[in-house]
């Protein structure tokens, strides 16, 4: 009756071949400039999933999942703003999340 309650018991959905999940720590002029919302729009337009969040130290963390060939396009779309300036980018590969279905902005009302 309430199958969603037993979701942990279900098999995870299959991911497209080549799916990668990557976490980026981004520094520069990235807070207060619309970075998170630009990232969400760009990720959604490219069919990527994940999340983006401001950090207390002024950096932004972006976790993205999908075709890694699209990750460079994602950053190109984000940087089309005159206000956003990325000065440092660190990345770390993670295990893909088969349950994730969208891209979210974290830490907002």
Cite the ranges covered by each PLM segment.
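Intrinsically disordered, low-complexity, mixed-charge
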Residues: 1-109
């Amino acid at each position: 009756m309430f199958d969603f309650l037993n979701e942990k018991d279900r098999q995870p959905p299959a991911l497209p071949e080549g799916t990668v999940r990557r976490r980026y720590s981004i520094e520069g002029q990235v807070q207060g400039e619309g970075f998170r919302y630009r990232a969400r729009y760009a990720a959604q337009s490219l069919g990527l999933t994940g999340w983006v969040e401001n950090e207390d130290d002024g950096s932004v963390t972006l976790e993205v999942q999908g075709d890694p060939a699209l990750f460079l396009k994602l950053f190109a779309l984000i940087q089309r703003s005159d206000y956003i300036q990325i000065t440092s980018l660190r990345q770390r590969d993670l295990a893909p999340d088969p349950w994730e279905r969208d891209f979210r902005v974290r830490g907002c009302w």
